[in-house]
Amino acid sequence: MSAWRYAGGPSMSDLPLFPLHTVLFPGMMLPLHVFEERYKRMIGACLDDDRRFGVVLIRSGEEVGGSAEPHDVGTIARITGVGRLEEGRMNLLTVGEERFRIVRLSQQEPYLVGEVERISDVHEHFFELEEPAERVAALFAEYYRLTTLMRGGWQRAINLPRDPDRLAYLVAAQLQAPAAVKQSLLEMTSLRKRLEREVDLLGVAIPTLTELLQSARRQRHTGFGVLN
């Protein structure tokens, strides 16, 4: 197996890493603007040989300049589109694939390279997932409605995936939560527990959003009254 090339087995060889202040989930899209020389070199190599790279949340440090310490668990990113700009800069569109865990880090290249192993969820029967998945879908539909109203947008029907795994990753990606919370969802190896955690998070977020929306409406009405 060539370096950096994913073969779909239980393990992988060395993988170039892109530390970000963002969590990428499997099946989700992530646009990237590449401008640092080290990452232009890394992405250039990936494009030349149809290789993947790993997106990892930064534990400490910054995205630009110097070295950042990443979390141990990240997601393989596959490049699906590239726009080349001046001075070798690039706009990328990527999609998350498998999750991985870093076993060992290397700084032999200008960028981080990790020896990684693939991780997956434990096997769980569908009947264990059906009830929490239905609750997540119902709660997220309301959460989506409220966040759309908060932005002043139109209330459009949302078409959620029926597959519990895809649903959990979609909700995790769309949830307005700290990166550390999203990272904890990524690291879970039980889909049922991931769904149950999302039920808890949505259950807290929805009343907060409802109150914020009602408060904004009261302020608008009060303002209109003063003007009149």
Model-derived regions, located:
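N-terminal low-complexity, acidic/polar interaction/targeting segments
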Residues: 2-228
